[in-house]
UniProtKB/Swiss-Prot annotation:
Disulfide bridges in this chain: none
NCBIfam families tied to this protein: PRK00124.1
Signal peptide: none
Pfam families for this protein: DUF188
CDD domains: PIN_YqxD-like (cd18720)
Similarity section: Belongs to the UPF0178 family.
HAMAP family per the UniProt record, alphabetical: UPF0178 (MF_00489)
Protein's organism: Vibrio campbellii (strain ATCC BAA-1116)
Family annotation (InterPro entries): UPF0178 (IPR003791)
This protein's name: UPF0178 protein VIBHAR_03247
Amino acid sequence: MKLWVDADACPKVIRETIVRAAERTGVECTFVANHVVPVPKRANIHSLQVPAGFDIADNEIVRRVEANDLVITSDIPLADEVISKGAQALSSRGELYTKDTIKARLNIRDFMDTMRSSGIQTGGPAALSQTERREFANHLDRILAKR
């Protein structure tokens, strides 16, 4: 199992949690972004900078991910693609996306996108709560313990 992090929009506190888990377990972890993501110098923790552009980082993750890998992302279409390749997807808020839940999440995302396109203000996501941080860390630990 490898960890792939969609680091373009990953909150710093979640990146720190991922780094601690990778250090503790020794799992191979790569942060993929279109900007420099500072990571500690460890043999198993890497940063991969891709060119700026729409979905470039996402496409690179999809290209490299393998079955049973774990992708950390809050990007619903990316989660759908990696799940279809046999990988797992976990949001930075601690939601584990599955084959059973991802289609409903895509439908909600598309509906909200349609509303925004028609001029309706939908607002952004709430700030990451302490409960969501804990939920993320707990899910990550459970997944890594099963590998």
